[in-house]
Each structure stands twice: as C-alpha cells, then as structure tokens.
C-alpha cells in the first residue's frame, strides 16, 4: 500500500501547507484558524461502533449515548451479543441503530487486514455490513486508519462549511462535494479537518466527534 498515513501534527502541518497552494480559500483561512486537531483514533470494533453511534445525531447526543454504552460494557462484541433489545434501548440506541449494532457484532470484519488495504477497498469491505454506509466507512478510514486522501462528502458539517467558505447558495450534495474534494488530493483528510474547524469557528459548535 502506497497511501500516505497521517501519524502526527507534523503531517497536518504538511497537508495544510500543500492545501494553501492548491486552494486560495484555504490559504485565506488557515492563518486565522486555531490548531487543526489531529483526530487520530484507535482502530477495531470499538471505534467502528462509536462511529455508527455518531450517525445522524448531534455531537452532544452521540457523546451522551457513547458514555452510556461504555458504562454498560456494550462496546464489547460479547456483551452486545448477550444484550437484550431493551438493554440497548436503555443506553439510548434507536430501533434502527440496534439492528446496525447487532449487524456489526455479527460481522466477520478483519480489522487487522483493513490496515493494509487501499482506502477504496476498506470502504467496499465495510459497506458490506448493514448499517455502514460511505460516511461511516470514510470516517473510520480517516480517523482510525489515518488515511490522508479520503473525504466524507456525505457529512452535513463539511457540506455546510464548504457552502460558507465558497459562498455557495446551497450546500453541495454528496456527489458534488466528492467531486470538489478531488481537487484537494492527496490531502483530502486534512481538508476535511480544516473544514470541520472552520465550521466550529463559524457555527460555534462541533461538527464532528
């Protein structure tokens, strides 16, 4: 695998320098931004489960649910398999999310082999599991595997940040933003981090966990 892996804050700085040359709008805002977070996470079942919990809910709501899940021990495969639906509802999971969580617990994902797969293959492998769409797979590749050239164009905060920064009338669609983000290769994941920080600055709230 020849893909660049984001390992440290120095990688973020390198990516920001490259993005300044690629996109004038980025060049304008980077000096005005606080430190762009590294956002590297561990990989494995626990982190993928956490990303599923984050789907289509606010950062605050996801954090609250995740705290309850960890307290109950439901961040472990064996505990989820033994849990009743009511026990999973009690920690804040919706009926649909319970299905997704059980699907993940029963999946045969080889987390170790994901580390050396091309990003496109990682997304393909993960999205075979019910409840894992492109957004979840791309966020996992970005934060847990450290891939530098992956974006999550289905993310509403990234869409809104792009609309604000580029003075667009409407948020770009997932398809439109995917096309736009290709211009930021090979540092799409750093562009995403920059846009989330810009969203936070403009909206005074976090756009990503």
Where are these regions (language model features)?
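Generic structural marker for isolated residues within well-ordered, non-membrane alpha-helices
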Residues: 50, 66, 84, 123, ...
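Conserved short-loop catalytic and cofactor-binding motifs
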Residues: 50, 89, 110, 146, ...
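Alpha-helical scaffolds flanking conserved acidic
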Residues: 13, 43-47, 79-82, 120-123, ...
